[in-house]
Protein backbone atom coordinates (compact mmCIF):
# COMPACT_ATOMS: atom_id res chain seq x y z
CA UNK A 1 0.00 0.00 0.00
CA UNK A 2 1.40 3.44 -0.89
CA UNK A 3 2.51 5.83 1.83
CA UNK A 4 -0.25 8.26 0.89
CA UNK A 5 -2.93 5.58 1.22
CA UNK A 6 -1.50 4.48 4.56
CA UNK A 7 -1.42 8.08 5.76
CA UNK A 8 -5.01 8.64 4.64
CA UNK A 9 -6.25 5.54 6.52
CA UNK A 10 -4.41 6.42 9.73
CA UNK A 11 -5.51 10.06 9.52
CA UNK A 12 -9.15 9.05 8.96
CA UNK A 13 -9.10 6.66 11.93
CA UNK A 14 -7.53 9.28 14.21
CA UNK A 15 -9.96 11.93 12.95
CA UNK A 16 -12.96 9.77 13.83
CA UNK A 17 -11.66 9.35 17.38
CA UNK A 18 -10.71 13.03 17.71
CA UNK A 19 -14.11 14.16 16.47
CA UNK A 20 -15.84 11.98 19.08
CA UNK A 21 -13.56 13.41 21.77
CA UNK A 22 -13.91 16.99 20.52
CA UNK A 23 -10.13 17.29 20.17
CA UNK A 24 -9.65 17.47 16.39
CA UNK A 25 -8.03 20.91 16.45
CA UNK A 26 -5.72 19.94 19.31
CA UNK A 27 -4.71 16.75 17.50
CA UNK A 28 -4.08 18.64 14.25
CA UNK A 29 -1.79 21.06 16.06
CA UNK A 30 0.03 18.20 17.79
CA UNK A 31 0.55 16.28 14.56
CA UNK A 32 1.76 19.42 12.82
CA UNK A 33 4.24 20.03 15.64
CA UNK A 34 5.64 16.51 15.22
CA UNK A 35 5.75 16.93 11.44
CA UNK A 36 7.46 20.33 11.72
CA UNK A 37 10.05 18.89 14.13
CA UNK A 38 10.74 16.05 11.68
CA UNK A 39 11.26 18.58 8.89
CA UNK A 40 13.45 20.96 10.88
CA UNK A 41 15.52 18.62 13.06
CA UNK A 42 17.65 16.15 11.11
CA UNK A 43 18.83 14.36 14.28
CA UNK A 44 15.25 13.70 15.38
CA UNK A 45 14.34 12.54 11.88
CA UNK A 46 17.41 10.27 11.66
CA UNK A 47 16.61 8.58 15.00
CA UNK A 48 12.90 8.20 14.31
CA UNK A 49 13.46 6.75 10.83
CA UNK A 50 16.39 4.46 11.76
CA UNK A 51 15.43 0.80 11.40
CA UNK A 52 17.85 -0.52 14.04
CA UNK A 53 16.65 1.71 16.88
CA UNK A 54 14.08 -0.18 18.98
CA UNK A 55 10.49 1.02 18.83
CA UNK A 56 10.42 1.50 22.62
CA UNK A 57 13.34 3.96 22.37
CA UNK A 58 11.55 5.89 19.63
CA UNK A 59 8.40 6.02 21.77
CA UNK A 60 10.41 7.35 24.72
CA UNK A 61 11.87 10.00 22.44
CA UNK A 62 8.36 11.12 21.43
CA UNK A 63 7.37 11.24 25.11
CA UNK A 64 10.45 13.32 25.97
CA UNK A 65 10.26 15.81 23.10
CA UNK A 66 6.48 16.24 23.24
CA UNK A 67 5.59 15.95 26.95
CA UNK A 68 2.45 18.10 26.71
CA UNK A 69 0.85 16.33 23.77
CA UNK A 70 -2.61 14.81 24.34
CA UNK A 71 -2.26 11.26 25.78
CA UNK A 72 -4.57 9.81 23.12
CA UNK A 73 -2.50 11.41 20.37
CA UNK A 74 0.66 10.11 22.07
CA UNK A 75 -0.83 6.60 21.99
CA UNK A 76 -1.55 7.06 18.29
CA UNK A 77 2.06 8.09 17.67
CA UNK A 78 3.26 5.05 19.63
CA UNK A 79 1.07 2.84 17.42
CA UNK A 80 2.45 4.45 14.26
CA UNK A 81 5.98 3.72 15.49
CA UNK A 82 5.08 0.15 16.50
CA UNK A 83 3.69 -0.48 13.01
CA UNK A 84 6.83 0.99 11.37
CA UNK A 85 4.88 3.80 9.67
CA UNK A 86 6.92 6.74 11.01
CA UNK A 87 7.90 7.91 7.52
CA UNK A 88 4.21 8.53 6.80
CA UNK A 89 3.80 10.91 9.77
CA UNK A 90 4.18 14.16 7.77
CA UNK A 91 1.57 13.00 5.26
CA UNK A 92 -0.69 11.83 8.11
CA UNK A 93 -0.49 15.33 9.59
CA UNK A 94 -1.38 16.91 6.24
CA UNK A 95 -4.27 14.48 5.64
CA UNK A 96 -5.56 15.01 9.18
CA UNK A 97 -5.48 18.82 8.76
CA UNK A 98 -7.46 18.47 5.52
CA UNK A 99 -10.11 16.40 7.30
CA UNK A 100 -10.37 18.96 10.13
CA UNK A 101 -10.56 21.85 7.66
CA UNK A 102 -13.27 20.09 5.68
CA UNK A 103 -15.31 19.29 8.79
CA UNK A 104 -15.01 22.85 10.13
CA UNK A 105 -15.56 24.55 6.74
CA UNK A 106 -12.07 26.08 6.82
CA UNK A 107 -10.25 27.19 3.69
CA UNK A 108 -6.47 27.45 4.08
CA UNK A 109 -5.18 30.57 2.33
CA UNK A 110 -1.53 31.47 1.85
CA UNK A 111 -0.65 35.01 0.82
CA UNK A 112 2.82 35.58 -0.61
CA UNK A 113 4.04 39.13 -1.15
CA UNK A 114 7.29 40.94 -1.91
CA UNK A 115 7.15 42.76 1.43
CA UNK A 116 5.62 42.04 4.83
CA UNK A 117 1.94 42.97 4.73
CA UNK A 118 0.43 44.97 7.59
CA UNK A 119 -1.96 43.15 9.93
CA UNK A 120 -4.89 45.37 8.94
CA UNK A 121 -4.39 44.48 5.27
CA UNK A 122 -4.27 40.77 6.09
CA UNK A 123 -7.37 41.09 8.29
CA UNK A 124 -9.25 42.88 5.51
CA UNK A 125 -8.20 40.27 2.97
CA UNK A 126 -9.29 37.48 5.31
CA UNK A 127 -12.69 39.14 5.82
CA UNK A 128 -13.23 39.65 2.07
CA UNK A 129 -12.22 36.08 1.24
CA UNK A 130 -14.54 34.74 3.95
CA UNK A 131 -17.40 36.74 2.41
CA UNK A 132 -16.65 35.56 -1.12
CA UNK A 133 -16.08 31.90 -0.30
CA UNK A 134 -18.58 31.65 2.59
CA UNK A 135 -15.97 29.67 4.50
CA UNK A 136 -13.80 30.26 7.53
CA UNK A 137 -10.35 31.36 6.44
CA UNK A 138 -7.06 30.20 7.99
CA UNK A 139 -4.66 32.80 6.63
CA UNK A 140 -0.90 32.51 6.56
CA UNK A 141 1.48 34.94 4.94
CA UNK A 142 5.04 34.82 3.78
CA UNK A 143 7.48 37.10 2.01
CA UNK A 144 9.17 36.37 -1.32
CA UNK A 145 11.20 39.36 -2.59
CA UNK A 146 11.43 37.74 -6.05
CA UNK A 147 7.81 38.75 -6.68
CA UNK A 148 8.98 42.39 -6.99
CA UNK A 149 5.49 43.61 -6.05
CA UNK A 150 1.88 42.46 -5.83
CA UNK A 151 0.68 39.23 -4.23
CA UNK A 152 0.13 35.56 -4.94
CA UNK A 153 -2.88 34.10 -3.13
CA UNK A 154 -3.22 30.33 -2.80
CA UNK A 155 -6.79 29.33 -1.85
CA UNK A 156 -6.76 25.61 -1.20
CA UNK A 157 -5.68 24.21 -4.57
CA UNK A 158 -6.32 27.42 -6.58
CA UNK A 159 -3.73 30.14 -7.19
CA UNK A 160 -4.40 33.81 -7.96
CA UNK A 161 -1.16 35.39 -9.17
CA UNK A 162 -1.29 39.20 -9.16
CA UNK A 163 2.47 39.66 -8.81
CA UNK A 164 4.61 42.05 -10.83
CA UNK A 165 6.90 39.12 -11.65
CA UNK A 166 4.01 37.21 -13.28
CA UNK A 167 2.88 40.29 -15.21
CA UNK A 168 6.42 40.79 -16.52
CA UNK A 169 6.59 37.12 -17.55
CA UNK A 170 3.29 37.48 -19.43
CA UNK A 171 4.50 40.68 -21.09
CA UNK A 172 7.72 38.91 -22.14
CA UNK A 173 5.74 36.04 -23.67
CA UNK A 174 3.50 38.52 -25.49
CA UNK A 175 6.51 40.38 -26.91
CA UNK A 176 8.10 37.11 -28.09
CA UNK A 177 4.95 36.24 -30.05
CA UNK A 178 4.65 39.70 -31.60
Swiss-Prot record:
Keywords: ATP synthesis, Cell membrane, CF(1), Hydrogen ion transport, Ion transport, Membrane, Transport. It comes from the Bacteria. Its main location: membrane. It holds the Pfam family OSCP. GO terms for cellular component: plasma membrane; proton-transporting ATP synthase complex. F(1)F(0) ATP synthase produces ATP from ADP in the presence of a proton or sodium gradient. F-type ATPases consist of two structural domains, F(1) containing the extramembraneous catalytic core and F(0) containing the membrane proton channel, linked together by a central stalk and a peripheral stalk. During catalysis, ATP synthesis in the catalytic domain of F(1) is coupled via a rotary mechanism of the central stalk subunits to proton translocation. This protein is part of the stalk that links CF(0) to CF(1). It either transmits conformational changes from CF(0) to CF(1) or is implicated in proton conduction. F-type ATPases have 2 components, F(1) - the catalytic core - and F(0) - the membrane proton channel. F(1) has five subunits: alpha(3), beta(3), gamma(1), delta(1), epsilon(1). F(0) has three main subunits: a(1), b(2) and c(10-14). The alpha and beta chains form an alternating ring which encloses part of the gamma chain. F(1) is attached to F(0) by a central stalk formed by the gamma and epsilon chains, while a peripheral stalk is formed by the delta and b chains. This is ATP synthase subunit delta. It comes from Moorella thermoacetica (strain ATCC 39073 / JCM 9320). The gene is atpH.
Amino acid sequence: MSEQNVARRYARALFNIAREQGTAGEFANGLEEVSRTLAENSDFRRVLYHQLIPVREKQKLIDTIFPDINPLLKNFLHLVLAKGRERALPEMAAQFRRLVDQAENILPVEVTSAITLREDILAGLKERLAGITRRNIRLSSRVNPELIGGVVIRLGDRVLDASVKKKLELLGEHLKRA
